[in-house]
Each structure stands twice: as structure tokens, then as C-alpha cells.
UniProtKB/Swiss-Prot annotation:
EC number, UniProt record: 6.3.2.9
InterPro entries according to UniProt: Mur-like_cat_sf, Mur_ligase_C, Mur_ligase_C_dom_sf, Mur_ligase_cen, MurD
UniProt protein name: UDP-N-acetylmuramoylalanine--D-glutamate ligase
EC class: ligase
């Protein structure tokens, strides 16, 4: 790289992978975090700095971890000093692993992880080595060490700083778009622009598939609907949620653009694929009441899709930390598919105000929410955890929130 002094801001999972990658390249790494513990537990940094320290001199460039805001004081200081700020995605896309090998990228508001994991599963069933990485849980700078087709899930955080073209992706897809992370991006327009930045990563911009006319690229709707009709004809398949069919068909379309995969193999993959947890995860039935864990639903749009998929009268558990939007748009779906709402956590009162006129009970936490939902439920009802909010008011992650819900329901023993 030729650059010797690099600042890495944020030393979580991705930040550690960035520091490790740079250190192995012989770079002098200056690690920055708000936590002394995080600094102490990262052996790849040469200089430990707290966020309250002064911005150092003689820095070649700055790498911000995906969760670090572009308005972070150190990011602002770097830009004021005309020092380049990049993400792990931009570092990875300059390496020979991406320049010389086939890779795909997926972004969108909802469905990214399911789509990319199904794409990985489908390609492997077809005998094609493939590895999912990025926002899916394996940092891209770690995952790219695997040989084979690289499948990169990219968040708006990772794409927000994309100003330079890194044309390495053979295929790409923007699945969908709806309000999300407005607390981070500041506006819906800026959020959309971060997603559109995926086009800067394409070898050929015409190979970017999009599902919304607000984006530049090839519309995938006609092809995806054709594949969805194919699945509808397969009576041997277990019933699928509408959004799952959509995600699987998007993955198949992306795969088909590069590899000839038989429809029969696609159908077999759909039948045997195990979806990741906390995404419309059916937990079972107790006393005639059905329980679904959709803790991953951290946006209003995701909860709307959950309600549409159920298509029956549900008692919906909402709440957590608001990501910067109103809950009013949920009302049409709630009136159609829900009996009532139990609102919990930091923005429970805000939910009750936005859903004025619809039955809402306000509680403090998830335990109380489940007890309240069970008091209201009768045989045939669905208790749906689909919070439409981030989890950070009371939990470390949506995974922890979902795991505790499963434990409270009594469907799974969980050790946390």
C-alpha cells in the first residue's frame, strides 16, 4: 500500500479485522476507541488512543469501522486535515483477492443476510465454492482469505463514504429500500445515496440489479416474479413466507447471471435451506397460540412485511430504540392483520401516541410484553415479536433480544 501510519476508529469485530489486516501489511496502526478494554484487547495496534485524545499528526489515512458515524469527531478532524477516510470494504476492494476473483455484492434495507446466505448455499450445492462475508457477520478482510466466489453483504454504513470507484463486483443487487438508520444518515435521501454507491463497485454498471425505480440499474421484478411463480407451482415445498420466496428468487437471479444453475437444483435448495434465526422464526404452539420470533425486524417496513406474511390476527410486540422515524405508517397493516399491540422499551409511549386509536398496551420490558400478549391471546392467535426498533435500549443486539424471547416463551433453553 505504501502508507505507513493509519488510524483505525472503532475496535469491535470489524475494527479488529481492519487492524489485523493493516498490521500484517507492515502498517503502523493507531487504534481509537471509547473503551479502554477494547484497546487493551486488540493486539494488532501499535498506539492506543481514546476518542477524547487529540487527533494525531502525520497520518496517511483513516479507516472507520462500519458502526462509526461519518460525523464522529475523529472523522471530522481527518477530513478537516484533508486526510482520506475509508471503510473495510474499500480496503478489501483494492486487494488482488477481489481484483482477480469473481465476487458479488448485495445491499438493501431488509433481507440482505437471508439472501446472501441462500446464495452461498445455492452455489455450494451447485459445486461452486462460495463464501459469504461482510455485514453478514464475517468481516470482509477476514472472509476474503477464502478462495472461491466472494459474496459480500454491504450495509449503508459501509457504503456511505464511497466516493471513489472500485470496480470489482461481477454482479450486484439493491434488494429494496425503506426508512432505516435515519438517526445515522440524517435523511432518507442520504440513506438512498449510500445504497446507490454500490454501483461504484461494479465491473459493469449494467450488472447491478435493483428493485426500486429510485435507483440506477436493471429492474429485477420481471425475472424474480417468474421464479416466484415457479416456486408456487411446487406443491412438495413446505409453505413459504412471501418475503422468503422473494429473497430466494433474488439470489437465484444473481447466481443465474453468472452460473447456469438448473431450476431443479434451485427448488431443492429452497426445500433444504435453513434460514438464519430471528427472522420470522416459528417457535411452535402452546395452548393453541402460535409464537414467532422476528427480532431482526428493526424497521417499520420489516414489521409490515412480517404482518403481511402471517396474514392472520396477531398480537404484536413492538418497541426498543427508535431509529428516527414515525410508527404511523404501521397502522394500515395493523388494522388488517393484528388484534392489538404491546409496546415495550424506550419508545413505548411514542408508539402508543403514533398508533392512537388502535389497541396498545404499554409495558416496561420484553418479559412484561410477553405476559401481556399471552393474557390477550386465545387459541388460533399469533404472538409476534417484530419490534420495528433497534434493540440497544435493553439488549446488546437483536440476537440477544430474540434469544431471550425464545427462552421466555419456553421453546428453547438459552445460556447468555
Amino acid at each position: 500500500m505504501g502508507l505507513k501510519r493509519v488510524v483505525v476508529i472503532g475496535l469491535g469485530l470489524s475494527g479488529k479485522s481492519i487492524a489485523r489486516f493493516l498490521a500484517r501489511k507492515g502498517v503502523y496502526v493507531l487504534g481509537v476507541d471509547s473503551s479502554i478494554q477494547a484497546l487493551q484487547h486488540c493486539p494488532y495496534i501499535h498506539e492506543k488512543l481514546l476518542e477524547t485524545d487529540e487527533f494525531p499528526t502525520q497520518v496517511d489515512y483513516v479507516v472507520r469501522s462500519p458502526g462509526i458515524s461519518k460525523d464522529h469527531p475523529w472523522v471530522k478532524a481527518a477530513r478537516a486535515a484533508q486526510i482520506s477516510v475509508v471503510t473495510d470494504i474499500q480496503l478489501a476492494f483494492q486487494t488482488k483477492e477481489f481484483i482477480e476473483q469473481k465476487s458479488f455484492g448485495i445491499t438493501g434495507t431488509v433481507g440482505k443476510t437471508t439472501t446472501i446466505l441462500f446464495l452461498e448455499y445455492l452455489l455450494r450445492k451447485a459445486g461452486i465454492p462460495a463464501f459469504a462475508m461482510g455485514n453478514v457477520g464475517v468481516p470482509i478482510l477476514d472472509g476474503m482469505q477464502n478462495s472461491g466466489v466472494r459474496l459480500v453483504e454491504m450495509s449503508s454504513f459501509q457504503l456511505a463514504d464511497q466516493e471513489t470507484s472500485y470496480p470489482v463486483l461481477s454482479g450486484g443487487m439493491i434488494l429494496n429500500i425503506s426508512d432505516n438508520h435515519l438517526d445515522y444518515h440524517g435523511s432518507f435521501l442520504e440513506y438512498c445515496q449510500s445504497k446507490q454507491n454500490l454501483s461504484l463497485c461494479m465491473r459493469n454498471p449494467e450488472d447491478l440489479w435493483v428493485g426500486d425505480q429510485r435507483f440506477c440499474g436493471r429492474s429485477y421484478w420481471e425475472e424474480v416474479q417468474k421464479y416466484m411463480r415457479l416456486l408456487d407451482k411446487e406443491s412438495a415445498l413446505k409453505p413459504l413466507y412471501l418475503h422468503d420466496k422473494y429473497n430466494y428468487c433474488c439470489a437465484y437471479l444473481l447466481a443465474q447471471a453468472e452460473f447456469p444453475i438448473a431450476k431443479s437444483l434451485f427448488i431443492e435448495a429452497v426445500a433444504t435451506f435453513k434460514k438464519p434465526s430471528h427472522r420470522m422464526e416459528y417457535l411452535g404452539e402452546k395452548c393453541g397460540v402460535h409464537y414467532i420470533n422476528d427480532s431482526k425486524a428493526t424497521t417499520v417496513r420489516a414489521t409490515e412485511k412480517a404482518l403481511l406474511s402471517i396474514g392472520s390476527r396477531a398480537i404484536v410486540i413492538l418497541g426498543g430504540r427508535n431509529k428516527g422515524y414515525s410508527f404511523v405508517s404501521l397502522l394500515p397493516s395493523l388494522r388488517r392483520f393484528a388484534k392489538s399491540v404491546v409496546a415495550m422499551g424506550e419508545c413505548a409511549q411514542e408508539i402508543a401516541q403514533d398508533l392512537d386509536g388502535f389497541p396498545v398496551t404499554v409495558v416496561r420490558n420484553l418479559h412484561e410484553a410477553l405476559l401481556c400478549a399471552e393474557e390477550q391471546a386465545i387459541p388460533g392467535d399469533v404472538v409476534l415479536l417484530s419490534p420495528a426498533c433497534a434493540s440497544f435500549d435493553q439488549f446488546r443486539s437483536y440476537e440477544e433480544r430474540g434469544a431471550i424471547f425464545k427462552q421466555l416463551v419456553g421453546m428453547e433453553e438459552v445460556l447468555l
